[in-house]
A protein has these predicted regions:
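Structured, non-transmembrane catalytic/binding cores
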Residues: 11-15, 21, 55-63, 123
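Short coil/turn segments at secondary-structure boundaries
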Residues: 7-9, 82-86, 99-107, 131-137, ...
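Short, conserved micro-motifs composed of acidic
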Residues: 3-39
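A terminal-accessory region detector
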Residues: 109-165
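Basic, alpha-helical interaction scaffolds
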Residues: 31-104
């Protein structure tokens, strides 16, 4: 069975202690050299060249902001806050949290995700006061993405027999 590799869509990436070392090109059986990349997309997750396994949150956050602005663009401030939050939870949050329970995120990554989440509420309720946003989220029973990801990670690890972090 011959499996042809599409060299235009195939990239090489190095993770580990020698991630920054320049490598020789890998050549396919057809004689086509595969490109080395600093970032690649695999199953919708952007993996970054690093000393440890690391993912990039730039594109998911960009997609999240696009989805959130789309919700505001469609319903604006015409719909009630409850409707907008329901749309936000069903259309925007999954874009931000896709597959992150399977990745180990740094504290700065989690803070970055929480910041994007909180900015939506600041825009919705027309405030820049984070305490007001936290009170609203608490009153509505809305958890920050870092908390949701913590719970999802535990479920993921238990379902696959992995040890808790």
């Amino acid at each position: 069975m011959d499996m042809v590799i599409n060299a235009k869509k195939t990239f090489c990436l190095r993770v580990g202690r020698r991630a920054s070392v320049i490598c020789a090109n890998i050549v396919t059986l057809n004689g086509i050299a595969l490109q080395w990349s600093d970032e690649l997309r695999y199953l919708g997750v952007y993996i970054v060249r690093s000393f440890r396994f690391k993912i990039s949150l730039d594109k998911p956050k960009r997609s999240f902001y696009r989805a959130a602005n789309s919700v505001f663009g469609k319903v604006g401030h015409v719909a009630s806050e409850e409707v907008i939050i329901q749309l936000f939870n069903s259309k925007c949050v999954p874009v931000l949290l896709y597959a992150l329970e399977a990745c180990s995120l740094s504290k700065s990554d989690l803070c970055s995700i929480d910041f994007a989440f909180n900015r939506f509420f600041m825009k919705l309720f027309r405030t820049n006061n984070i305490e007001i946003v936290k009170n609203i989220q608490s009153y509505l029973g809305i958890s920050l993405p870092s908390v949701v990801l913590g719970n999802r990670s535990v479920k993921f690890e238990l379902s696959f027999g992995l040890f808790a972090r």
